Structures are given as structure tokens and as C-alpha cells.
Amino acid sequence: MSSWNHGRRCLVFIACAGLLLICAALSLSLGSRQVTLAEIIGGVTKNAGFTMGELVVHQRIPRTVFGLVAGCALAMSGTLMQAVTRNPLADPGILGVNTGAALAIVVGIAFFGIGSLVQYMAFALLGASVTAVFVYAVGSLGYGGATPVKLALAGTATSAALSSLVSLILLPRSTSMDAFRFWQSGGIGGATFGGIASIAPLIVIGAALGICAVGSLNALALGDDAAAGLGVKTARTRLLGAVAGVLLCGATTALAGPIGFIGLVAPHIVRLIAGPDLRYVLPLSAVAGASVLLLADTAGRVIGSPGEIEAGLVSAFVGAPILVFIAVRSKVRAL
């Protein structure tokens, strides 16, 4: 790698980190009540004796921290799924993984009476895992194996079917499922440090597994035969990457609800400026994903003031045309 490329990637990382700090500051300052920089500093540094503005900032801190964590996790999950399937359209939402996790939680609430975050995570991971395996199996049928188009179609069809099942379960239980219906929109409001701490171990494990698989996934981009020739165990690499992606997505979905398109948009933005090497794409996507989610959440609060629009709805509104652009630009070819 040339010193120019190395220097450029360092500059990109510094720029992304700076953008993330700006997004975090905007998340703390904007909303139904805008606060000043001095109030942000006071709200972050004080433990008591808050002014009204500082109190608002203090209450927004868990939301902003969770936005950072969830954005990183979803972007890394999308990056890993794109690498595992060699599909530029792969994303936890497009492949139906988010919807599978949501359906599992609905079933758990309606029929098994689950209520704790740990139970939510267990059901979300189960639903995400089963859906990921099912979509990949369906997409692998027929001539050519698991092509990008077939995986996207299988994921979209599966997501639509699972969404209808979610609605079928929700409709007769309008009163008891009101809280879940709000959760289903996908958002980071109402996050607490306790909830973040509960999902943090799974996210750390998923991120560690993804980082361990980066070298082999880079080789996998050359094709299975070439990767095998380089000594890569393709089946194990795909399994490791898939498990990491499901852990990252499932844990985040359990607390935030299904937030789509973050895992699709962030990796593509990063590849445009940093190239295809996953050693750089994965960490930069995490930073970009956190920035995008915080911007979506902040925009939802500003546009919907004095109420708010959930971040999942904003990201879907922005991400849908980007999906069309990516499909047209790449002609849906494999990575």
C-alpha cells in the first residue's frame, strides 16, 4: 500500500471522527428545546445543580450514547453481511433480519409473556438467526447460487411475509401491544444506560468476531476458489462473519427496534472514499453509521417538534432512494 493511500485513509478517519463529534453535539443540543454550547458542557460535566438547559442535555446523554453504539453496530453488521454474501445490497433490513427479530419479539410478548430486555435479546437473536439462514437458503436455490439479486429478492419477500405476521399478531391486541407498536418504528429515544449495558457484551463480541474475520473476508471478495487457494476456509469464514452480523443486529434491534438502511448506506459511503479493503471499511463504517443514525434522530426531533419522528422512519425515507441509486449504479453485481 502506498504512503499516499495510507495518508488519505488516515485523513478520512480523522474527518469521520470529527463529523461524529459534530453529530453528537447536534444530538445533545437540538430538539424540542435547543440549548447552548455552555449548557452542553454543563450538562455533560455536572452531576447536580443543573439549569433547565443543562438538565435537558443531561437527559439526552443516554440517547446520544445509544445512537453512537447502535449506529456503529448496524453499520458493522451491514458491512459484514455485504462481505459474507458478496452482495452490495445486503443490509439487516433488506435481508429481512430486522423483521425476523421483530417477529420473534412479538411472538414472545404475545404468547410467552416476555418483558425483560434479556428476554427481548434472546428472542431477537433467535429470530434474526433463523431468518438469516432461511433467506440465504432460499437465495441459494436454482442456477447460479446465492446471487445478489436473488438474495435481495428473497430478503424482501421474507421481510414482507414476516411483517404481515407481525401485523396479524398485533391487531387483535391493540391495548397490550401499544408499546411494541411504537418500538416497531425503530428509534433511540427512551434509551437508558442500564439498557445499553445489557446489550453491550453482545455488541462487543459481535464486533470482535467481525474484526477477526476481516482478513479472510477480504480474500473471500476474490471468489471462493481464489480464497480457498490462499488457504482461507470459506465456510468457516462465512459462518464467523454471519454470526458477528447477527449478534450486532439482533442486540441492537432488541433495544432500538428495527432501524433500516444504516447498514446499507454507511459502508457504501466509506467505500467511495476509502476503497474496498475491509480493514479500513469496517471501522470507518462504524463511525459513519453512528454519524448517520445521530443525524437521522436529530432531524426527526427537529422536523417533528414539539413531538418527534422516529429515527427508523427518517433513515428509511433517506435510505430508499440511495438503495435505488446503488442498484442502478452497480447494476446489482456482486462485490
Region locations from a protein language model:
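Alpha-helical transmembrane segments in inner-membrane proteins
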Residues: 1-335
